[in-house]
Amino acid sequence: MRRMIEDELIANGIYPNLIGFEYVCIIVEYIIGSDRVIKIMKLYELVADIKNTTTEAVERSIRTIVSKYNRGSDKKLCNSEFIYTLAWKIKGRYMKDE
């Protein structure tokens, strides 16, 4: 699953050397594994606990990723829209493969 998320991010021009790359992977992986919608701030707190950082740092790093994605896209997304769109796209592909 993690590899599919990384491949999708790289295909969108977001590379692993960016700080928020791993944060996005963790959040998307958690969303895909969950059977309910979770508030994005709760997910930021989860990642902050896992990575021993602050929620603000996680949000700022993800905002960097989203702004990089928005530069190459016609549609401008906010953090939560980007994360949930990515998660559902990958989940749809994952379910199709099974």
Predicted segment positions?
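Basic, alpha-helical nucleic-acid-binding regions used in initiation and control of genome expression
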Residues: 1-12, 18-22, 33-98
